[in-house]
Amino acid sequence: MLSRLQELRKEEETLLRLKAALHDQLNRLKVEELALQSMINSRGRTETLSSQPAPEQLCDMSLHVDNEVTINQTTLKLSTRSPMEEEEEEEEEEEEEEESDS
């Protein structure tokens, strides 16, 4: 019973770290979205002021926008635990199993 409680506490800690990491990522994405919307709006205003935007503006905008293909190919890493933590936990579980078998 006690080991199950410890296991649940570790799982809770992991989930809380994951929640924090996802919250941070969501905030970064919101900031990026606002920046992109701002660039789109400024491009729209520029196009209404002049029929053809200056080549320098187009080049400058393209430097700040992320490559969509690269973003889509990026894998999302949700693990908040290091491989060392996982190995330590596995070793602890093995030790607990050995103790309970004895």
Curated annotation (Swiss-Prot):
Region annotation (Disordered) ranges: 73-102
Matching InterPro entries: SNAPC5
Listed PANTHER family: SNRNA-ACTIVATING PROTEIN COMPLEX SUBUNIT 5
Any GO MF annotation of the entry: RNA polymerase III general transcription initiation factor activity
UniProt-annotated location(s): Nucleus
Task of the protein: Part of the SNAPc complex required for the transcription of both RNA polymerase II and III small-nuclear RNA genes. Binds to the proximal sequence element (PSE), a non-TATA-box basal promoter element common to these 2 types of genes. Recruits TBP and BRF2 to the U6 snRNA TATA box.
Protein name in the entry: snRNA-activating protein complex subunit 5
Coiled-coil residue windows: none
Biased composition, class Acidic residues, residue ranges: 85-102
Top-level division of the source organism's lineage: Eukaryota
GO cellular component: nuclear body; nucleolus
GO biological process terms held by the UniProt record: snRNA transcription by RNA polymerase II; snRNA transcription by RNA polymerase III; transcription initiation at RNA polymerase III promoter
Biased segments, Polar residues type: 73-82
Pfam family, one: SNAPC5
Keywords: Nucleus, Transcription, Transcription regulation
Assembly with partners or alone: Part of the SNAPc complex composed of 5 subunits: SNAPC1, SNAPC2, SNAPC3, SNAPC4 and SNAPC5. SNAPC5 interacts with SNAPC4.
Gene that encodes it: Snapc5
